[in-house]
Amino acid sequence: MNRQKKLVILVLRYVSIFLNLFKDSGYHKILSPFDGNIVPSDMIAESNISRDVFGNSLGIQPVENKVLSPCACIVERISPVGNAMLLKVGNAHLIINIGLEFEKYKKEFFKLNVVEGQRLSKGQKLMSFDIEKIYKVDTNFVCTITVKQNRTSRHVSFINAKHVSFDTILCTLNVL
């Protein structure tokens, strides 16, 4: 009996080690969903973004009219107009806004490629938008990404750069 217990314990240890090799570390690299020029959050006219009310934010003036998934995540919510999305990553949320003057936008400005509840992979196309039509109604057009974490999570530090492309790592999140 003693020998069987030792064998069971040994097998359980090896199984545990094996499973830990594939365990999610909890750290997710968040890539830029946009290709464009960085606008620090304190320079954005929208006061909730500039004061980081919803979480740590970063503005980007896009040079391309498409938005890609910044990481593996789930689409939790899409705004009625289609200019904003709430993405779930572990216990954190990413809020992506294509412009902040949503009351001026029309649904036809945005072409969605995803639906609520959909699981996304990193780099998957979320949407495209008509940048010319948006600039006509919103001269201060800027896109934002906001990281909203639970109370126990730490402050998010974004990359210090002037320009980002779709493969630029904006920040790393611990989402466990």
Enumerate the predicted regions with their spans:
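Contiguous, well-folded functional domains in the mature portion of proteins
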Residues: M1-L176
